[in-house]
């Protein structure tokens, strides 16, 4: 639908189909990016999956569509539209697709309702949320009921960076995606840990995109800061961040063998799931290739990262999708 017409104001993303199999993502009259039909066509996605040897793909909303900035009721309405559309794709191909819904996180009460609908009515494995909500970090008390609901439902929560910090200084060189996203994800991880969300909800299954961003690679600095300035870092939770390593999930999308080996050493292969960022340029164009390239990785660890960890994180029956 025309979202500007539907809600009475602009700022929403829409597609301009300017040629076959291709569209421009536009925010009002401003160009955002060009995308192919694998962004909206399940059939095209399955063709790519078959080409790349991907048995199952997890579907989620493009983060630019989160629209947390909009009026709460409108964000909720849009989330329902997006989730219903995604559920339709999963329903037609239940052996190939798994769904993660989107939520109106700018209205936590509505987010709880939509999360419940996503799991109980639409059959989704969980939800994808942004790294912050209009400047509120994920430890904000207002957001806690959403995480609590996810834990109670046994739903996975996947955190993806969006609306990156420092945007005004990063207009050149694609820096929001190259530098801003890893930093944004690190802020999200630290907010969850320092804020005590996992301490209060030990059963919450939460994962972070892009290998946890810069967090894993600065854990020494973060832990040291926690120890030397508890007056600043331990104000909401007295448990150090290192104690939580292995209690949350990361994906494997780090683009570098040494970085992936480091993640395996840090959190274990059983906490790392294959991440592809399909179908965008920063994704892994041959999903799983980096994992497969680690010759020194035991078969058990490789299988965990290729499919086993994802099954666990998403709460899927082990071996459900194996031939």
Over which residues does each language-model region extend?
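Histidine/acidic-residue-rich catalytic or RNA/ligand-binding cores of hydrolases
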Residues: 68, 167-174, 212-227, 260-267, ...
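Histidine-centered divalent metal-coordination motifs
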Residues: 1, 160, 210
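Acidic-and-aromatic substrate-binding clefts and catalytic sites of carbohydrate-active enzymes
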Residues: 36-40, 67, 105-111, 134-141, ...
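Active-site gating/metal-coordination segments in enzymes
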Residues: 55-195
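Mid-to-C-terminal alpha-helical segments outside catalytic/metal-binding sites
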Residues: 1-56, 84-92, 113-117, 204, ...
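Active-site gating loops and adjacent loop-to-helix segments of metal-dependent hydrolytic enzymes
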Residues: 1-37, 164-185, 222-245
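Aromatic-lined glycan-binding groove of carbohydrate-active enzymes
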Residues: 193-196, 200-245
């Amino acid at each position: 639908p025309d979202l500007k017409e539907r809600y009475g104001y602009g700022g929403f993303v829409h597609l301009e189909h300017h040629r076959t199999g291709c569209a421009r993502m536009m925010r009002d009259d401003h160009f955002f990016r060009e995308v192919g039909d694998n962004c909206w066509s399940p059939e095209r996605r399955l063709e790519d999956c078959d080409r790349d040897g991907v048995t199952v793909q997890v579907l989620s909303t493009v983060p630019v569509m989160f629209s947390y900035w909009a009026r709460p009721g409108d964000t909720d309405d849009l989330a329902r539209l997006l989730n219903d559309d995604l559920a339709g794709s999963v329903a037609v191909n239940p052996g190939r697709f798994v769904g993660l819904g989107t939520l109106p996180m700018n209205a936590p009460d509505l987010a709880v309702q939509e999360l419940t609908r996503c799991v109980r009515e639409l059959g989704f494995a969980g939800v994808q949320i942004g790294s912050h909500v209009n400047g509120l970090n994920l430890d904000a008390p207002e957001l806690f009921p959403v995480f609590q609901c996810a834990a109670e439902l046994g739903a996975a929560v996947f955190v993806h960076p969006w609306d990156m910090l420092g945007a005004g200084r990063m207009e050149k060189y694609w820096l929001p995606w190259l530098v801003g996203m890893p930093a944004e994800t690190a802020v999200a991880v630290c907010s969850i840990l320092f804020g005590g969300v996992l301490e209060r909800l030990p059963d919450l299954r939460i994962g972070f995109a892009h290998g946890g961003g810069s967090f894993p690679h600065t854990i020494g600095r973060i832990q040291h800061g926690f120890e030397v300035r508890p007056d600043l870092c331990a104000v909401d939770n007295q448990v150090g961040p290192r104690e939580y390593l292995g209690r949350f999930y990361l994906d494997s999308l780090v683009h570098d063998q040494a970085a992936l080996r480091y993640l395996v050493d840090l959190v274990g292969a059983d906490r790392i799931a294959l991440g592809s960022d399909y179908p965008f340029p920063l994704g892994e164009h041959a999903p799983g290739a980096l994992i497969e390239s680690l010759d020194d990785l035991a078969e058990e660890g490789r299988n965990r990262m290729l499919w086993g960890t994802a099954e666990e994180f998403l709460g899927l029956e082990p071996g459900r999708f194996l031939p």
